[in-house]
Amino acid sequence: AHLDGWEPFPRYEGPHKTHALDLSRTATHVYLSHHHEDHFDPQTLREIGPKPIIMGAFRHTGFRQQARALASRLIEIENGQCYTLGKMRIRIHAETPSYRTNSVLEIDTPCGKIVNANDCGLDASVLQDIAARGKVALFFSTLNVLANGWPFPYLRQNESDYAVRVAAVREQVREAFALGMKILKPTVSVAFAGPVSFLHPLSAHL
């Protein structure tokens, strides 16, 4: 569901996408972290074919209906509840308040614990609960230091507080990632660099 992005960005086409789709077709299940289009792309899901979809039991009725229509089976996991899938144990931690659809995925595998925070806000108490259940081998989370998400599409460079607001959000992003590493103490941390590369013209204003 990650293979296509927001519509203003260049379409992801060509051999790299073909290869990614071929790999995706071998997957047994699909995890949907949240409703944003760079994580939930219905066309991509149609292209890889119906598969069991795993997601949180969100309040967003439209999201759930869309996922159900695309899945061979929809598996909705209540917040923090354990779901067994083969040799793995899965937990989904939904972001609060409950109207949000963001989620953190915690997977216990025979090879170690994986935590994928996606774009979700990190809650210290949730991270502490995860850490208490065992050593984290891999921690994935966003580190969009370009800060090209909200509120920056609504700002102009000539605004007097532009630089201050950009710097504040960038610092929040760094602090959140550092908090995750501090609490989880993972063997390896992997940062998502954000939806647009630094040299892309869409980031020129930064």
Whereabouts are the PLM-identified features?
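Active-site neighborhood of phospho(di)ester-bond hydrolases with catalytic His/Asp-centered motifs
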Residues: A1, T26-F40, I54-F58, V115-C120, ...
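Pre-active-site segment of Zn-dependent metallo-hydrolases
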Residues: A1-Y31, P42-E47, L122-K135
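Active-site-proximal loop/helix segment associated with metal-binding centers of metalloenzymes
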Residues: H2-F9, H93-I114, C120-S125, A131-G134, ...
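A conditional alpha-helix N-cap/helix-loop micro-motif detector
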Residues: R11-G14, S98, C120, V169-R174
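Active-site environment of divalent metal-dependent phosphoester hydrolases
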Residues: H35-F40, T61-R64, Q81-T84, S98-T101, ...
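Metal-dependent catalytic neighborhoods of phosphoester/phosphodiester hydrolases
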Residues: D41-P50, P201-H205
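Metallo-beta-lactamase
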Residues: K51-G112
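Cap/insert and terminal regions of metallo-dependent hydrolase folds
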Residues: A124-L206
